[in-house]
Amino acid sequence: MGNMNEAIQITDAKKRYSAGVLKYAQMGYWDGDYVPKDTDILALFRITPQEGVDAIEAAAAVAGESSTATWTVVWTDRLTACDMYRAKAYKVEPVPNNPGQYFCYVAYDLSLFEEGSITNVTASIIGNVFSFKPLKAARLEDMKFPVAYVKTFPGPPTGIVVERERLDKFGRPLLGATTKPKLGLSGRNYGRVVYEGLRGGLDFMKDDENINSQPFMHWRDRFLFVMDAVNKASAATGEVKGSYLNVTAGTMEEMYRRAQFAKELGSVIVMVDLVIGYTAIQSMSNWCRQNDMILHLHRAGHGTYTRQKNHGVSFRVIAKWMRLAGVDHIHAGTAVGKLEGDPMTVQGYYNVCRDTHTKVDLPRGIYFDQDWGALRKVMPVASGGIHAGQMHQLLDLFGDDVVLQFGGGTIGHPQGIQAGATANRVALEAMVLARNEGRDIANEGPQILRDAAKWCTPLAAALDTWGEISFNYASTDTSDYVPTPSVA
C-alpha cells in the first residue's frame, strides 16, 4: 500500500505545472499529515481499487475528481488558490475483513460548496468519482458537516417537538398505516380505508410512493375523499388526525398546486418521494415552512444505491442530507420488518435524524461526530412488514420519537381495517405502560401482548394471525469495524 506519510506531492512549481499527466497524489490530493479544520466538510469513502492501483493513489484520485482535478495538468490551476481548493485525502485504512477494500477519508474546504444546497454538495461528492475506471467500486459511507455549513440550511419546517404540539400527542410513538392496495382503489373506497384506520386508533394514514394521479383515481378526488375521512375520524375520536397526501408530480408547479389544495382542505401534512430530487425536496420544504405544513418524505428508490455495501451511498448519508434539506419525516427502516436493515445500522440512521449531537458510534456505522447546530430533528418512520406482535421490539429499538406504520398489519386484519388499527393502538398503549412501569419489554414483550389480548379481541386476532412472524434474512449492509474496548 505504500508509506502513507511519505511526502510524494510535487511542490516544485516548474515540475508541478509542466504539461503532462501526473499522479493525483503528486498533484497534492494526498496529504497524510493533514489535520482537518473545524470548517472542513469530511467524507468517508469505501473504495475498491483495481488490481495494481495503489490505495493512496486511488484515495487521492477520489479527492481530486470530487474537487478540482482533471486527468492532466492544466495551466489554469495557476490562476486559482489551488492549495486551498484541492480536496485532501488524509487517511487510508484497510476495511476489516474485506480484502482489497479501503476506507478513504477526504477533507473539503468549505469554500468549495454553495451554502444551503444539497444539490451542490452531491454534485461534487458523488458527481463523478463513482464511474472512475481505476476503482472497481466506491461507496460514500459517512459525512461530517461543520456547524458553519449546517447553519446555512433552515432544516425541517416543523420538527419533532412542534409536530407533537400540533398533534397534542406525547410520550409514545405515533401510529400510521399505508393505504392498501396502494394502486387501483377509487377515491371513495380509498377514503373509506383512511376513515377506518383513523377511527380505529391510528394517528396517520398514508399514500404510498406511487399513488399520484392515475386513471382509476385523480389526485383531486383522492384529496377530497381522504380529507373528508380525516375530518370525520377526528370528530369521532376527539383526536387530531392526518393523512400523508402525496403531492409528487412531474413538475414543481404541479406539486405546488397539489400542496396548496391539500392545505385549503385542512391537511396538516403533505408527502413527497425521494425520486423528485434534492432541489425539489428543498423547494417543497420551503413551501411547507411558509405554510405551516409537516413534510413527509418517502425514500422511494433509495435501495438502488444504498443497499450494496461496496458501491453506492449509505442511507446514513442520505438521512443527513435530508435533515439538512428539511424534511420532517423520513422512512429509515424497521430492522424487524420485510425491508433491508441490520438493527444496529438502522439505529444509527435514527440517531442521525434525532440527535442534537451525533457521536462516533462504529457498531452503528457512525464514523464522525456531527454537531447539528440546533437544527430541528427529523421523525424517523418504521414501515414495511411490521405487525402488532413486534411492538415490544419496535419500542425497545427505537423509543418514542418514531412513526410506526402498519400497512398490511392494519388492513390485513381478519376482522377488518378498524379492528387492525385498534389492535395496533392497544398493543402500543400496553407496551408503553409496561415500559413506564419499569418492566423489561424486550424480554417480557410477548407476555405483555398476550395479557393485553385477553381484553382486546382485535389484538388477540392479530396475534393469532401473524404470531411472531418476522423476516429473518441476513443484512447486506452492516458496519465494518474492529471491536475494541472503546467500541465493542
Swiss-Prot record:
Q: Which UniProt keywords apply?
A: Calvin cycle, Carbon dioxide fixation, Lyase, Magnesium, Metal-binding, Monooxygenase, Oxidoreductase
Q: Which domain of life is it from?
A: Bacteria
Give the EC number.
4.1.1.39
Modification type N6-carboxylysine: residues: K206
Q: One Pfam annotation, family name? A: RuBisCO_large
Which reaction does this enzyme catalyse, per its entry?
A: 2 (2R)-3-phosphoglycerate + 2 H(+) = D-ribulose 1,5-bisphosphate + CO2 + H2O; D-ribulose 1,5-bisphosphate + O2 = 2-phosphoglycolate + (2R)-3-phosphoglycerate + 2 H(+)
The record's listing under PROSITE patterns reads: RUBISCO_LARGE
Q: Where does substrate bind?
A: N128, T178, K182, R299, H331, S383
**Site description Transition state stabilizer, residues in chain:** K338
| Cofactor binding: number and manner | Binds 1 Mg(2+) ion per subunit.
- Which BP terms does GO give this entry? reductive pentose-phosphate cycle
For molecular function, the Gene Ontology terms on record are: magnesium ion binding; monooxygenase activity; ribulose-bisphosphate carboxylase activity
In terms of InterPro entries, this protein maps to: RuBisCO, RuBisCo_large_chain_AS, RuBisCO_lsu_C, RuBisCO_lsu_C_sf, RuBisCO_lsu_fd_N, RuBisCO_lsu_N_sf, RuBisCO_lsuI
Cofactor(s) of this protein: Mg(2+)
Locate the residues binding Mg(2+). Answer: K206, D208, E209
Family stated for the protein in its record: Belongs to the RuBisCO large chain family. Type I subfamily.
| Its job | RuBisCO catalyzes two reactions: the carboxylation of D-ribulose 1,5-bisphosphate, the primary event in carbon dioxide fixation, as well as the oxidative fragmentation of the pentose substrate. Both reactions occur simultaneously and in competition at the same active site.
Assembly, in brief, is: Heterohexadecamer of 8 large chains and 8 small chains.
Add the further remark from the entry: The basic functional RuBisCO is composed of a large chain homodimer in a 'head-to-tail' conformation. In form I RuBisCO this homodimer is arranged in a barrel-like tetramer with the small subunits forming a tetrameric 'cap' on each end of the 'barrel'.
- PANTHER family in the cross-refs: RIBULOSE BISPHOSPHATE CARBOXYLASE (PTHR42704), RIBULOSE BISPHOSPHATE CARBOXYLASE LARGE CHAIN (PTHR42704:SF17)
**Protein's UniProt name:** Ribulose bisphosphate carboxylase large chain
The protein's organism comes out as: Variovorax paradoxus (strain S110)
